[in-house]
Structure formats: structure tokens, C-alpha cells
Amino acid sequence: MEIGPNHRFKDVSYIESPNQSGPFAPELPDTIVIHYTAGASTESAIRTLCDRKRKVSAHLVVGRDGAVTQLLPFNIVGWHAGRSAWGERTSLNRYSIGIEIDNAGQLSERDGCYESWFGRTYPAEEVLHGTHRNHSEASYWHRYADEQLEVVEAICAALIQRYGIQYILGHEEIAPSRKIDPGPAFPLDSMRTRLYGSPLA
Ligand SMILES: [Zn+2]
């Protein structure tokens, strides 16, 4: 994954979202925030993230097949983190690049079927039974595709190299009272271990 002088990945489709603030302050961004879309398709996620009325955006969207779409250059502040805090920092949009991954999120089990909040059912092999880091009991989660996990790790490695990213965080870690993405199906701790040598954010 190669990043050009215009702060965009080369060979990646680009659709610019109008939902953006100005450039980052000097020395920033130094953080990546990982999200899932909790939606029905990559196309609908991109539509939402480019809709002025919705007032949300992200720098990148990763489809189920691993295809990447960039919506903002990496030097521009996006609107993905919302009310959030990490250490002494608040409003993490000012510090971070947002990556949205196409995934249905938490699923509910009924008679051996697993259903998303928008009513689609998923086969057992696409479902993980696991405990969220912010919860005490296990529940059901849509698995990420291997292609998605591979490309997200490659994206993070490229952003670390280009921008000196120091923190890779889940939305669930910076807004634990209101967000549960990317959830236990995303191997955040093992990815941080591979990239930084430690599972800790
Ligand atoms: Zn999120």
C-alpha cells in the first residue's frame, strides 16, 4: 500500500466526503481508530459517510472482499470518532485516521440463526461467539473476512511508516459507554502485538 504526496493511497478508489474539517495540527495524525460499519453493504456505508446531512465520515472503507475506498486524504480531519477520550485527549477526530470495515456487528441468535439489527441472517461459519472487552458475557458477532483483516493490517503498517502512527485504537476503547465497534471479532490486540510488540493500546 503506497501513499502518494497528496496523502492518498495509490491504486485505491477515491470518493471525497464533504464531511471534513481542515488539516490536522502539526505532528498529527498519530492515531488510527478502527470501526465497523454495522451496515448491509459497503456501498450503503460509503453513501452514508458522504452524506452531508449525516455529518459522519472516515478516511477509508474496507469491503467484505478487501477492496479499499478512500474518502478523505490522510492530512484532513474526518468525523468518525464523535464524543471520545483517550488518556488526556478528548475528541479523537483531531488526532486520528478513521478506518471503517464492512461488518454487520453484534448478532442476535434465534433458533440456531444469527440475525443482524437490519434483519439479515448469517451462517454459523460467519459468526463468532465471544466476549466483548467492555462486556462480561459472551454474545454473537459477525466475523470479518480474512481479506479484510489482511488489508487493514497492511494499511496500518503503511500509515505507521508514513505518519509515525503511535496508537491503534478501537472505537469501543475511546467511547466505551456508547460504542462496541470493532468488537471481539476484530483481532485488535494480536494486530497491535504484531505491529508494535505489545497488545496494549
Ligand atoms: Zn465506530
Predicted segments with their positions:
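Short, low-complexity, polybasic intrinsically disordered segments
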Residues: 176-201
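Active-site-adjacent loop/helix surface patches within enzyme catalytic domains
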Residues: 2-166
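Low-complexity, intrinsically disordered regions enriched in charged/polar residues
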Residues: 43, 168, 182-185
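Acidic/histidine-rich, metal-coordinating catalytic segments
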Residues: 163-178
